[in-house]
Amino acid sequence: MHSVRYSAYGLCLESNLPLQGLAPCGRTEVPDLLIEIEDGERFPAAPTETAYYVSDWRDQGSGDAGLKIYKLTDASYILRYAEGVEFHIAADSTRIAARFASHSSLVDMTSFLTGPVLGFVLRMRGVIALHACAIDVGDKAIVLVGDAFAGKSTTAVMFARLGCGVMSEDVAPLCLEGRAVAVRPGCTEVALRPSAVKYLYGSADALPKFSDNWEKRRLDLAATGAFSHRTLPIAAVYVLTNHGTAPDAPCVRPLSSGAAMVELLANIYANRLFHRELRLRELDTVHRVVETIPVKEAVTGGWSSPVERFCEVVLDDVRAS
């Protein structure tokens, strides 16, 4: 079988198997990362080394830690998920060996690969990415920062329904272009909770599941023409907060430079991988963002306020800036 090339987060990926949720990469481009997906029948035992990182969140079925990361003696990393998916990332971050157990699937593996695993690879390469969605608003992008329950995916889909392009729903890699700070596009799919699908489309079954092992629903942005593949300078960064009782929500509020630094540093993607050089690069990049780009608090109002109205408030703020 011929290898397949894809583009995501500024990287050209070459995989030995087709993967969903990724935009194609030209055959003339040199791959930055080779992905070898191995037979699920050979899923290995856990490494004997002490885990470098153990997640606080637990698998509902087994009660085991959802993610364990091992750093091997050759400086490579193994990311092992309780769902039966494992990734061995080479020390130079140019190769990934991916495996999944018989009770898992290629689709399950891909959902981890295209989000947290590639986010980890970016981190290994010294690329600073935010836990954020990125939206194409014309000749520039806006970045909406927030944790896993901030509503980034739902908000991204609503922006798409208002005619904007979605560049990424969860990982927003930053790049410095002269004095400007830009954001690169990521994957072509959005993962939505059933409650969000019901809110947006009237029924939780309006979109298909990613797989039988995962409750989240899959929205293919490329199929609907809502994916933006452009790298764009950032017009503004919005830190999402859900103050349902705020009388003026949805609204946009200014943040001091100090508060902006704290919020952005707290939302650096894959910050479990840490060393001094990376920390210095983080500080430099975040300082550049705060120095050159408006960083504001965006109060959504939670589910008590229509998401469409929140998106309109943000777009009005972008136009007024």
Which residues fall in each region the model found?
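Conserved lysine of the Walker
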Residues: 152
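Long, basic/Gly/Ser/Thr-rich N-terminal segments
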Residues: 1-104, 312-321
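A broad, low-specificity signal for short, low-complexity segments enriched in glycine/proline
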Residues: 39-40, 57-61, 96-98, 103-107, ...
